């Protein structure tokens, strides 16, 4: 199978495609990384930097920015309502998918991911620059309300899925799922009081969806993982979660764009909300 076999092949572009569109005024290349300082060491020519924490999250309440703030972020980066935004970043595009998902919360649907992310671009010896682009501010319409309902899940939604047996997938590492650790093995074990998983959740680590070079696996391989291995189907109401929502946004992208599932929501509160919540039920082990 080729990339064209994905449900929405237009949402995933190659490094070659990006290289050919670096100067396309209708396209804005957006870098979003876990390491927020990485952009300054070198980035794709013309790419803007969107900091997942400083630019997309409310700085007081645990939530996202409001529609007016989102419009301001887009405006200062030369992004209009019809601009094609191509996201890429480190960590096999965790944070690129996260940023794309947040853009979708505000109704910006013309979005794509660069397959393989930053690492693939660098491995191919493609150009990087430290020069920061300057784009003229553009007018971006302000939504009356952020569109959370379609693709975002909250504690109550995850709890309902847990109690009713609806599909709930935990995309963290197996050790996190079993409750042996509260973060990935190579990270500080902090930020959450209890380890384990939401009762009824299935463990499907995000990493099963990518190849060693960070590119996405074929549709046939993904179908084996999610449709056959987890008994998921495009018509089911699915909630995915991780620790803070970034890894589960990667899985959300896979299910939504590559497999064409219609009802997938990302529970961005994830384990740092569930594992810290008083009396929230917790399961451990496999």
Which ranges hold each PLM region?
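Short low-complexity, flexible loop/linker segments enriched in glycine and/or proline
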Residues: 126-129, 184-185, 279-281
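Thiolate-centered catalytic microenvironments shared by cysteine-dependent enzyme domains
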Residues: 2-7, 64-164, 180-181, 196, ...
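Short, charged, surface-exposed secondary-structure boundary motifs
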Residues: 56-62, 121-124, 140, 213-214, ...
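Extended hydrophobic/aromatic segments used for targeting, binding, or gating
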Residues: 262-286
């Amino acid at each position: 199978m080729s990339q064209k076999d994905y449900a929405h092949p237009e949402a995933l572009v190659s490094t070659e495609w990006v290289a050919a569109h670096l100067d396309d005024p209708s396209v804005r290349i957006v870098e979003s990384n876990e390491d927020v300082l990485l952009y300054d060491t070198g980035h794709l020519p013309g790419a803007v930097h969107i900091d997942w924490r400083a630019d997309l999250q409310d700085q007081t309440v645990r939530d996202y920015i409001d529609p007016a703030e989102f419009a301001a972020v887009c405006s200062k980066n030369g992004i209009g309502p019809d601009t094609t935004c191509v996201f890429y970043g480190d960590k096999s595009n965790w944070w690129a998918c996260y940023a794309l998902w947040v853009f979708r919360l505000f109704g910006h649907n013309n979005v794509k991911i660069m397959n393989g992310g930053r690492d693939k671009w660098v491995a191919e010896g493609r150009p990087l620059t430290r020069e920061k682009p300057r784009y003229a501010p553009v007018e971006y319409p302000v939504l009356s309300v952020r569109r959370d309902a379609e693709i975002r899940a909250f504690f109550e939604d995850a709890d309902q899925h847990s109690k009713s047996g609806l599909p709930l997938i935990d995309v963290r590492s197996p050790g996190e799922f079993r409750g042996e650790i509260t973060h990935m093995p190579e990270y500080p074990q902090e930020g959450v009081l209890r380890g384990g998983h939401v009762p009824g959740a299935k463990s499907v680590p995000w990493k099963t969806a990518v190849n060693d070079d960070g590119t996405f696996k074929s549709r046939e391989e993904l179908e084996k993982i999610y449709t056959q291995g987890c008994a998921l189907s495009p018509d089911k109401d699915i909630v995915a979660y991780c620790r803070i929502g970034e890894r589960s946004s990667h899985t959300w992208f896979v299910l939504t764009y590559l497999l064409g599932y219609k009802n997938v929501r990302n529970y961005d509160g994830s384990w740092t909300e569930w594992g810290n919540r008083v009396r929230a039920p917790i399961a451990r082990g496999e």
